[in-house]
């Protein structure tokens, strides 16, 4: 479903309280604090309904705990009873390199493995993350260059769609965008094409703009 086809728009903080189980939502944001508030609300609502929730980002765990506590999440309670899991992970940068020689690919794989092993292990290994009902992935993939964009899309196809999507987990995955409207309107630019492709891969989208303006709706 395209943006034009969607007839049901909601405020992001309301939308995340109504996400159906098993749906994957992409969150494009211009303002980090707004994106965090939306993500935390998604986690908070899950905990209220006794869901196991996991939050993955590059931020230090104690900082995330403090920020969650500030909006009223009982962090100590839910981490103690294993309903809330907070992980600090390394952002992925080069999941896929299509045109490199074999030796360079193997070298990159070896170097990459140490950096991303904690991320992929947490996502794939139930003993590490349990069977989380809700997961927030905050910027777990860098998209600063065209090669990283290509790599990210391969990760979206090969990992999230094939692994996480079929696990039944409900997910919010966030990406920073400097200017959402101008970027997605540029159909010829690499970032505009990338955003449009992601809209085809997710069940819903949240656009979180500056000054706490935003809109969210289902895509499927």
Locate predicted features.
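Non-catalytic regulatory/interaction regions at protein termini and inter-domain linkers
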Residues: 1-220
């Amino acid at each position: 479903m395209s943006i034009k086809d969607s007839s049901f728009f909601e405020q992001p903080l309301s939308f995340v309280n109504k996400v159906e189980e098993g749906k994957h939502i992409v969150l494009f944001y211009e303002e980090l604090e707004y994106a965090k508030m939306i993500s935390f609300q998604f986690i908070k609502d899950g905990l209220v309904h006794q869901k196991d929730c996991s939050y993955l980002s590059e931020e230090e765990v104690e900082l995330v705990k403090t920020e969650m506590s500030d909006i009223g999440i009982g962090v100590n309670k839910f981490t103690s009873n294993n309903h809330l899991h907070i992980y600090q992970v390394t952002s992925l940068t080069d999941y896929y390199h299509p045109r490199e020689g074999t030796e360079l690919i193997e070298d990159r794989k070896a170097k990459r493995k140490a950096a991303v092993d904690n991320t992929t292990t947490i996502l794939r290994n139930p003993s590490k993350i349990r069977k989380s009902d809700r997961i927030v992935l905050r910027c777990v993939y860098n998209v600063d260059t065209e090669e990283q964009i290509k790599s990210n899309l391969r990760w979206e196809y090969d990992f999230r769609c094939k692994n996480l999507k079929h696990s039944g987990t409900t997910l919010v995955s966030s990406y920073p965008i400097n200017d959402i409207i101008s970027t997605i309107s540029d159909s010829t630019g690499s970032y505009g094409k990338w955003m449009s492709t992601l809209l085809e891969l997710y069940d819903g989208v949240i656009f979180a703009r500056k000054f706490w303006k935003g809109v969210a709706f289902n895509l499927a």
